[in-house]
Amino acid sequence: MSALVPIVIEQTNRGERAYDIYSRLLKDRIVILSGEITDDIASLIVAQLLFLEAEDPDKDIYLYINSPGGSVTAGFAIYDTIQYIKPDVSTICVGMAASMGAFLLAAGAKGKRFALPNSEIMIHQPIGGVRGQATDIKIHAEWILKIKQRINRILAERTGQPIEVIERDTERDFFMTAEEALKYGIIDKVIERRP
């Protein structure tokens, strides 16, 4: 069942114009990442980021995150695009940023990473499941360990935490309040109202 997407009506000098809510928000350079991070979702987010860069490479983009995480490769596609494009991307956690969602929250431009006061943030090591021959299982296990090291290294860079702290904390699910995420370095400020 697909979710109901609200339509907003806007008055222009040419009359009324109807937009779905996400298209209207995109006009204000707001991108919404909600739900599981899949390849399809990553493609949509990447396309919106690239579009907004083409529209105005000097104006900030606002990425609102409410996600339990998802595919590591899909998350890396979004992360790399955030780093690649010229505009600063401000990240804002509303609700939850867990796993790859928390990773992307930390990916925002330094000084422009926020969470609302009742947000929850969770980091952990990547999860993988593979079946097959012993050799294939070994190959996948070695690969996921490399991914784990890459995620930990980037989290250490983005948060300012020593790699040893990141390795310890991501060994299991590590939950944080917005205030704790601020102290940890995942975000730069807890915000209650727009400035």
Swiss-Prot record:
Reaction it catalyzes: Hydrolysis of proteins to small peptides in the presence of ATP and magnesium. alpha-casein is the usual test substrate. In the absence of ATP, only oligopeptides shorter than five residues are hydrolyzed (such as succinyl-Leu-Tyr-|-NHMec, and Leu-Tyr-Leu-|-Tyr-Trp, in which cleavage of the -Tyr-|-Leu- and -Tyr-|-Trp bonds also occurs)
Top-level lineage group: Bacteria
EC number: 3.4.21.92
Catalytic residue positions: 99, 124
Gene Ontology biological process terms from the UniProt entry: protein quality control for misfolded or incompletely synthesized proteins
One Pfam entry name: CLP_protease
Gene Ontology molecular function terms on file: ATP-dependent peptidase activity; ATPase binding; serine-type endopeptidase activity
Subcellular location: Cytoplasm
The family this protein is said to belong to: Belongs to the peptidase S14 family.
Function as written in the Swiss-Prot or TrEMBL entry: Cleaves peptides in various proteins in a process that requires ATP hydrolysis. Has a chymotrypsin-like activity. Plays a major role in the degradation of misfolded proteins.
Official protein name in the record: ATP-dependent Clp protease proteolytic subunit
Organism: Caldicellulosiruptor saccharolyticus (strain ATCC 43494 / DSM 8903 / Tp8T 6331)
